[in-house]
Amino acid sequence: TKDSTRIYVYLEKKNSNTFDGFVGFSNNETKKITLNGYLDLKLENILVSGETLSLYWKTDGNDQKTFKASIELPYLFKTPIGLKTQIQVFRQDTTFQNTKTAIDLSYFANYNTRFYLGYQGTESSDIQNLNSNLISDFNNSFITTSFDFTKPETNNLTFPIKSKLFASIGIGKRKINTLSEKSEKNQFLLNIQATHTFYLNKKNSIYINSQNNYLKSNHYITNELFRFGGFNSVRGFAENSLQAYFVSLLLTEYRYIISPNLYLHTILDYSLFKNEIENTAITKNLTGIGIGMGLQTKNGLLRLAIANGHAKKQQFEIYNTIIHISYNVKF
């Protein structure tokens, strides 16, 4: 008819899968060849059901090895209910190995907001069978509840997320077996992470990332503590080189956009954490200062950061400077 209108919509698939990693070989102290590197892979909607599959592997060839895998299946049976499972293995040289498993039921309030109710447990093995007061075999289990909110930044490939909030609490128990103690203790777990980008104008912005973890227990052992430090934590320190039962991180960047594909930024990271030594809580402060850049290429985002980490009242030393490199490819 004269008044009829036809609308044609052509949908083009958007790349949402990401890959980041490298593999290298080096000689250790015994002149043997060791494998080092990392792999960070995230696949989304490959089965056209909205699922997310993540794989992470990292080794420094000597002290630490980490493996993580998770899968999330949303909208089961066409309902807002989903399922998420994950496994994480962390090995510290010949000292201990932790294996953590978790399963969560999720409720999708909307595309950006999710609620979780789940269970997680960790089994830790004292590889050298020392069973001391510092490192020991243990098992823990927690009932957890979580909240996840993400606000995307549309039409921005370099900074696709404007705001993100994740909060999780867990209540559970830990069983340990040492030479001096065989007991079961109640524990409380708290994890809060929040990020936000404040846009001053088209070229200037401030990025803030707050990461907070707390484990409440009557007694702590080394192989259950949180580990932090590195590119996605307080920069200027080696990956997972720090440990604590309480840690609060504030990571900040002032960003200046030179062109649509290139930006420079400052680095100012602050860390407050607590450890327990001989039943006495010790509080420490760390600072990471540096500069960085990001380059949006055809295939992904290349990031380079140079940061120097030092403790409070510690003199600045140039040899503490660490270079962090990341290339996140989308396909």
Where are these regions (language model features)?
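Conserved short loop/turn motifs at secondary-structure junctions
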Residues: T1, W57-T59, I87-R91, H310
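Surface-exposed loop/turn segments flanking beta-strands in extracellular/periplasmic regions
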Residues: F77-T79, Y111, N139-F142, N223-G236
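Outer-membrane beta-barrel channels and translocator barrels
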Residues: K14-S16, I46-V48, L76-K78, F108-N112, ...
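Outer-membrane beta-barrel initiation region
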Residues: T1-I81, T150-F159, A244-S248, Y256-I258, ...
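C-terminal transmembrane beta-barrel domains of outer membrane proteins
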Residues: N36-D40, S54-Y56, K68-S70, K164-F331
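Transmembrane beta-strand segments of outer-membrane beta-barrel domains in Gram-negative
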Residues: S16-T18, I81-Y220, F273-E276
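Subset of outer-membrane beta-barrel
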Residues: E44, P74, A102-D104, Q120, ...
